Each structure stands twice: as C-alpha cells, then as structure tokens.
Amino acid sequence: MGSKRKSTVKKNKRLKKLKKTVYEEPEELKRAPHSFVIHRGQIGKSLLQLVKDFRKVMEPFTAASLQVYKKNTIKDFVALAGPMHVSHLCVFTSSDTGVNFRVARLPQGPTMTFKLVNYALSKDVVSSLRKQMVNPKLFSHAPLIVMNNFTGEGLHINLMATMFQNMFPTINVTKVNLNDIKRCVLMNYNPETKLIEFRHYAITTVPVGLSKGVKKIVQSKVPDLSNFDDIDEFLLKPELLSDSEFEETTSSHVVVPQKLVSRGNIVGTQSSIRMSELGPRLTLQLIKVEEGLMTGDVMFHEFIKKPDEKKDESKEN
C-alpha cells in the first residue's frame, strides 16, 4: 500500500509540473497588455463583424474566439481578467441614439465612453484596394501604435493618449526586432472637430533602386513572361509591365539597420517602407470619462458640464 501511495504522489507532482510547463507564459507575455473585446445588448451583423475586426487588431494579446452570451455580465469578464492577465476591456453597444464604444482599464477603471460616429469593416476597406495584403503572419505580433495631435488643454486628452498607448505593448527602440513590426495602428485627434480617426495598416519593406522586373524576381514572385520574347525584354523594358508599381518619394526611404526576413532588403542598403490598409476604420468622439469601472465620478463629459467648469468659462468671457 505504501509503495502505491508514493507512486500516486509522484504522479500528481509530475502532472502539476506538466501543467506549469504547458500553461506558464513567459514573463514578457504576462506583462504585455491583454484585452477582451466584447459587445453588450442587441447588435446587428455589421456591428458584430466590427467586434471581430477589432479583435483582429488587438491580436495576439486578446481572446480572439471569446464567446459572449446574454447571461454574461461585466463582472464575469472582470473575474476572468485576473487569471488571464487581461488589462483592458473594450465594449461595443448599440442603442436608439447610436453606437458607443467603451474602453476600461481593469480591474478598477477608469472608463472612457466614445460615440462611434462612423466605421468601415475590414472587408470593405480591403476590397477597395487594388493590392490586398493577405498574410496570417501579420497578426503574430502586436501592432505599433502611432498617435498624432493628442495634445492640448484638458485632462481628458492626456487620459485618452495614456489609455490607448497602454492598450499595446511598449517597444524598446534599441532592442526591438524589426521583423516583429508588421502592423501599425494610427490614431489622429482633430481638436477642432474633437474626432479621433483610427486606422490599421500592414507594414512592408521593399528594396529601392531596382527595376520592376528585377524587383519581382528578387522578391520571389513568379513573373508572367507570356508577353515577352526573352528575359532581357522583361528586365530592360519595365514600361511594358502590367504592374503599375512606382518608386515612392525619398521620404519613405530608410537605411536597413537589421537583417530582415523579407527578400532583397540587405543591411546597410536603402529600402522603401510601404503601408497597406487592413481595416477597420473608426471615427470616434469622446463623450464621457468615469473614474471607476463603468461607474463612479464623472471626470469629463462632452455635453454636461460641472458648475465649476461653467464658472471658469464665465470668468474667461
């Protein structure tokens, strides 16, 4: 009996170690911002697809296949957030007045409520492009976040910038592997209209100074030679090529500092950075900032002003 108990204890210890090796994430991944992207209430097919598109933007640090049921509450997702290292909750809701988008810092807030002024799904954005970027490896790393014009008076602007920046992993410029930067999220704030434009791009690099024919061969693309008498004509007469590629202005040219996986980009030579839109597109307007998680003191409201703020405005006038 004693030997059986010892073997059972050893087996349980081995199982515990195995579970740790399977589920234990590296510390870098644990520290990276994770998110839940969900919807609440009744929404249409278009908005449901937008939820899926936004999850795609937030990959790989999001629950891409998260199932949301009517009986689920915000508390349910908060309870899951701790064990799964989730730091942000993104919620799409629809009502008679329009569509709202909430971003909350877990577990205690703050919460920012945006009005979704306009949006375009990824499939609509991609279908409008002549060249479509289809590469599953694009989503193996988090996107680079670029924010423009998030400056000015008001605590809410700084809160917006901080909230959006903290939704994505920080990048160490001196240690970053350029092969990991495959996507970019661009956010632009217009202080006059108070609107935020959200765009999502794929980033590619191509060698500079090569003819169209040579570039196709270097990048391992199989060229169509049916319209040419020989290979020389293909290489020396680029105007006959059907592909309307062009050399961008020198402002998009950079010197390659690292070895890149993409073909033709050699360290120390110039390459051109190209961006292809992936979608979705969002136009947002900040409506409200709450101190807590979907509740608490209202720190900012676009349409309802506190008495102190009204006094300050009257003094200025």
Language-model features, listed with the residues they occupy:
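Phospho-regulatory, Ser/Thr- and acidic-rich intrinsically disordered linkers and terminal tails
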Residues: 1-317
